Amino acid sequence: MKITLKDGSSKEYAQSMSVIDIAKDISEGLARIATAGEVDGEVVDLRTVIDKDCELNILTFNDEKGKGAFRHTTSHIMAQAIKRLYPDTKLAIGPSIEDGFYYDIDRETPLVAEDLEKIEAEMKKIVKEDLPIKQYTMPRAEAIAYFKEKDEPYKVELIEDLPEDSVISFYSQGEFTDLCAGPHLMSTKPVKAFKLTSLAGAYWRGSEKNKMLQRVYGTSYPKKAELEEYLHMMEEAKKRDHRKLGKELGLFMMREEGPGFPFFLPKGMELKNQLLDYWREIHKKAGYVEISTPIMLSRHLWETSGHWDHYKDNMYTTVIDDEDFAIKPMNCPGGILVYESEPRSYRDLPLRMGELGLVHRHEKSGQLHGLMRVRCFTQDDAHIFMTPEQVRDEIKGVVKLINEVYSLFGFKYHVELSTRPEDSMGSDEDWDMATEALRGALDDLGLPYVVNEGDGAFYGPKIDFHLEDSIGRTWQCGTIQLDFQLPLRFNLEYTGADGEKHRPIMIHRVIFGSIERFIGILIEHFAGAFPTWLAPVQVKVLPISDKYMDYAQKVLDELNNSGVRAEIDTRAEKIGYKIREAQMKKIPYMLVVGAKEEEDGLVSIRSRFEGDEGQKSLTDFLAAIKMEIQAKTAREVKKEDDK
């Protein structure tokens, strides 16, 4: 039996071996930290026995899939603790998620925050008991009878939805048994560090028509230090929550009259418009033309594009003159209609069309989250139509543009290349060409990337950009997606140099993604303290008293007439109070004016970056701030010991 490992090396065994035994054979150290295995792409338990040639990857907590097994086990430990403490609890589902895990439960008396400590204490006992975790199966009818006897109606419903000939997978640890496909750890012992973080409501199976359950969230790590680092990040994230800062800084609001539909307030619109102006500026330089397509288009178009069949549940539809229409959830079909509005030649290609299009998608109410998950947003789409020979260079151009944008905001990022999934459309030749073009572009640019085998869209491979914010969280924003299918569906053509008709290749790409979501990310990344060029208010003029109001107004007028976004604080408050409030509003510069300033024609400058910056003439201050704004530089805040 030949086992091929991730690094390309191989091992030969005369008899069948479990994943954990192979891990031990490789290294005792690896076996100690292993959480699961991946056999020919399928994630399995460490106890799984291998009896034929295969490719094997030993997963640890450092692998996303290995992390999932670790945290899924933690969710079972939590459910076991809840059942020990509150036996009347009915269990629903408990998966691992990106930053931890949750379990949905149902009980007459909901849990309160104080209960979480009791549950954690019981979880520690379960970990200390070092309970072996075992997997076994049962026929569907027996599984239903088992959970009916246990009075677990949600488990019964899940099993009843499966085909009659299904064999049902169970996992048990001590007295606790759960319906689960796995994988899980070998025992409860490795789960050394965990924290139950919050309680929330969640509809059963995500439908508002079903009962509201209680969701218990938590996270876990192999080491206490890793948990503490994560919890510190979460505390920092709370302070930076864009919903909280958005309200405090007067940027946007959400109302129950429009759930998932954000209202941008004047300062928020200033911020949004700065981003849109910047987008237009860099795209014009990069050779894009801007278009705008209708917000509502006919059913026929969405049937041709495939959205009506595959995405209709997320679309808002209406009837006009007895014909079905849909508000667009994506900009691509409209862009295609623009492409086919006139004959195209190879001389017209590549054709780069950008659109800041307003799209609407029906997200479930439980998934809405400030600006991060909304039902209406502006997508910074661009669609590039090109010949096969142009694909590689166009991808490189998009990557460079994305790098320019993310670098401006101080984001680090990593890149993932997703290849052909099993369920895909198009020829092997098309897929090989497209994947090699993406891979080659990244290699040409010397950009490190991770390959996600089989994770591309059904219509083409893609590159995803995951940016890292100032507190270490990652956000997937930029995407470059190759598409063979829409040009085929819409029968797009161009006339080649040979005079014959050819099918163009299409790239879908976004940089910000959703402008609204990107604003939410920026609010949290900068903690509301935006670079001067982006700040809704760049300067606050602070007269020491009413006596200097005329001079303060003159300063304000000069600032505004010079294109600097400035406001004045005319309240009869002490200057210290005005300064503190301007600082709370994260305003980059405060200009204090009093007798000396008026007499000498100066302004006293206080900045968010260095505090007291002394006095300057207004002309000199204007020259400096305009240079900072034009260059889009981001001044760093000096630490106390640097001042």
Which sequence ranges carry the predicted segments?
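NTP/phosphate- and nucleic-acid-binding module
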Residues: 1-92, 97-643
